[in-house]
A protein has these predicted regions:
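Solvent-exposed interaction patches of small proteins and small membrane subunits
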Residues: 1-92
Length: 92
């Protein structure tokens, strides 16, 4: 995944944020916090993971499905953009 090397620091920042969120869930469970608080923390984790997934899928489509040397106005590029939008909305 050569494209991830270029965005590596941005992706690692996301992963570290997710790690912090998961650790917050663990602390909440250990401290026997209210169910609604734990559920909200888990929902935040899920949202963060979905955001990471969307970022990785978009990079994969742009660099492995699309031919980077091909004109940006091609029907393939338009279809790829449409797929990216659909995946992003699904993962929200």
């Amino acid at each position: 995944m050569a494209h991830t090397a270029r965005d590596k620091e941005k992706l690692l920042i996301r992963v570290r944020r997710i790690r912090g969120q998961v650790e917050a869930v663990e602390r909440a469970l250990k401290e026997e916090q209210e169910c609604t608080d734990v559920l909200q923390l888990v929902a935040a984790c899920r949202g963060a993971l979905n955001g990471l997934m969307a970022e990785l899928v978009e990079g994969h489509i742009r660099f492995h499905v699309l031919d980077p040397d091909r004109a940006k106005d091609s029907s393939q590029a338009a279809a790829a953009e449409e797929l990216i939008d659909i995946v992003r909305s699904y993962l929200k």
